[in-house]
Amino acid sequence: MARLKEIYWKEIAPKLKEELKLSNVMEVPRVTKITLNMGLGEAVGDKKVIEHAVADLEKITGQKVVVTYARKSIAGFKVREGWPIGVKVTLRRERMYEFLDRLLSISLPRVRDFRGLNAKSFDGRGNYSMGVKEQIIFPEIDYDKIDALRGLDITLTTTAKNDDEGRALLRAFKFPFRN
């Protein structure tokens, strides 16, 4: 079992049950999935960009990546319908907890000038989104082998009913919020 999953069920869930005054341990909010997305606008001019992004995201997550395609043509962005414009991957269960563990203990401390995560990045339903400016904060990425610095979006989907429950859950996981 993943280290964070064990910590969640043995320590975090009982503590949150009391804190949120819930009657059943199954009502306690939990993380259901983590979605990583790389929007690649520069892929319009160079098709190799998608290949490099797929390789990077597969190294980071250890899972097969899905290429996303443009739904409709937008002349202003020089994008045609059906062109590849991004990559994404959804992590659940064990891999999700392992990724979350690596993100909190290894990757976030490697961010330059890191002052904490914005505590206001919740969506109103207890889900949290954050952006990473460079993929090199992940230990799986070798700095010498990358072609360009790319950012990615990380979204944590939870079963929390509102932002306060979601915030309590992520604080229990020791998320480094700045405010």
UniProtKB/Swiss-Prot annotation:
For this UniProt record, give its keywords in alphabetical order, as a comma-separated list.
Answer: Ribonucleoprotein, Ribosomal protein, RNA-binding, rRNA-binding, tRNA-binding
State the superkingdom: Bacteria
Q: InterPro entries, per this entry? A: Ribosomal_uL5 (IPR002132), Ribosomal_uL5_bac-type (IPR020930), Ribosomal_uL5_C (IPR031309), Ribosomal_uL5_CS (IPR020929), Ribosomal_uL5_dom_sf (IPR022803), Ribosomal_uL5_N (IPR031310)
MF (Gene Ontology): rRNA binding; structural constituent of ribosome; tRNA binding
Q: What is one Pfam family matched by this protein?
A: Ribosomal_L5_C
Q: What is this protein called?
A: Large ribosomal subunit protein uL5
Q: Which organism is it from?
A: Pseudomonas fluorescens (strain SBW25)
Q: Which family does it belong to?
A: Belongs to the universal ribosomal protein uL5 family.
The UniProt function text for this chain reads: This is one of the proteins that bind and probably mediate the attachment of the 5S RNA into the large ribosomal subunit, where it forms part of the central protuberance. In the 70S ribosome it contacts protein S13 of the 30S subunit (bridge B1b), connecting the 2 subunits; this bridge is implicated in subunit movement. Contacts the P site tRNA; the 5S rRNA and some of its associated proteins might help stabilize positioning of ribosome-bound tRNAs.
Which BP terms in the Gene Ontology apply to this protein? translation
The terms describing its cellular component in GO are: ribonucleoprotein complex; ribosome
